[in-house]
């Protein structure tokens, strides 16, 4: 948060609990304000009533508005629900969240431009952001090794930016986390996986389990991923990227700690954010 500074931060806390008069979001907002953060609560149209009430309560108290996440289908029906939106559009950041469907949307070609070009009252919103992610929820079914997946969300955003929209379209994604990913119901041992972002693609490394037939030690698999990453001809390493520095250290020294699942998620997310910041205008 120290690095984030005063930059606006959207937060959807709808998965957390609360009552009609008190939601976890209220406490989060209070602590964020005390820390000097510019938190804007985010919600979907279908948000639970208790959470929707807390979002409105925080918005009225903090005076920073609301971020509204809608689906592609809800763009077409905007004229029917915008009349019930509780605060002015000028105080609302609209997020068109394609989630994991972004690759399917890209496959539609130029026909997908129409909903964005005809976005109802497009210039009335405080901001409009396209979000999505092409990382699968699970690598089950993927072959062992490295698979390159296109950054479909960046492809779509780039195409829409060139489609003569009459509003500025901002970019958002899920970094290297699958939009539908979950940690519930996962029983070990599990394959050792990792994800790394280059300019046009995600490099998705699918490994094997650490126990049982065909297994390999976790450390051995992570070190192999690091060695493959540093040898990528189009890697474009970033000098001040912590994630890149950690991966370089793992590849450079056979005695360095090769990391664990949580640390490799951190390396991948940090690298993704730093690279994307360099790519966006």
Where would I find each of the regions flagged by the language model?
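Active-site beta->alpha loop and helix N-cap motifs at the rims of alpha/beta catalytic domains
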Residues: 1-85
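C-terminal accessory extensions appended to soluble enzyme cores
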Residues: 108-120, 125-281
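Structural alpha-beta junctions
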Residues: 2-8, 31-40, 60-66, 86-93, ...
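Short catalytic/ligand-binding loop motif for oxyanion handling, primarily in non-cytosolic enzymes
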Residues: 50, 102-104, 137-139
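Short loop/turn segments at strand-loop or loop-helix junctions that form parts
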Residues: 11-15, 93-100, 131-135
């Amino acid at each position: 948060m120290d690095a984030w500074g005063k930059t606006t931060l959207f937060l959807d806390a709808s998965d957390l609990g609360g009552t009609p008069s008190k939601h976890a979001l209220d406490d989060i907002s209070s602590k964020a304000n005390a820390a000097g953060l510019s938190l804007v609560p985010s919600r979907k149209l279908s948000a639970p009533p208790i959470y929707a009430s807390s979002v409105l309560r925080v918005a009225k108290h903090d005076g920073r508005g609301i971020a509204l996440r809608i689906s592609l289908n809800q763009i077409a029906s905007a004229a029917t629900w915008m009349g019930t939106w509780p605060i002015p559009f000028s105080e609302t950041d609209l997020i068109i969240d394609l989630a994991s469907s972004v690759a399917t949307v890209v496959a539609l070609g130029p026909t997908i431009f129409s909903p964005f070009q005809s976005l109802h009252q497009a210039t009335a919103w405080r901001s409009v952001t396209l979000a999505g992610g092409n990382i699968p929820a699970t690598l089950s079914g993927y072959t062992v090794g490295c698979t390159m997946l296109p950054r479909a969300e960046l492809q779509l955003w780039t195409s829409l930016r060139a489609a003569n929209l009459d509003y500025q379209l901002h970019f958002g994604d899920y970094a290297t986390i699958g939009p539908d990913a979950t940690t519930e119901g996962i029983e070990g041992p599990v394959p050792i996986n990792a994800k790394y972002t280059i300019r046009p693609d995600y490099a998705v490394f699918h490994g094997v389990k650490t126990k049982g037939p065909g297994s390999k030690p976790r450390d051995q698999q992570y070190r192999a991923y690091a060695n493959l990453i540093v040898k990528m001809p189009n890697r474009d390493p970033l000098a001040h990227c912590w994630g890149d520095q950690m991966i370089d250290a793992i590849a450079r020294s056979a005695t360095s700690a090769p990391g664990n699942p949580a640390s490799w998620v951190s390396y991948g997310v940090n690298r993704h954010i730093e690279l994307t910041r360099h790519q966006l205008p």
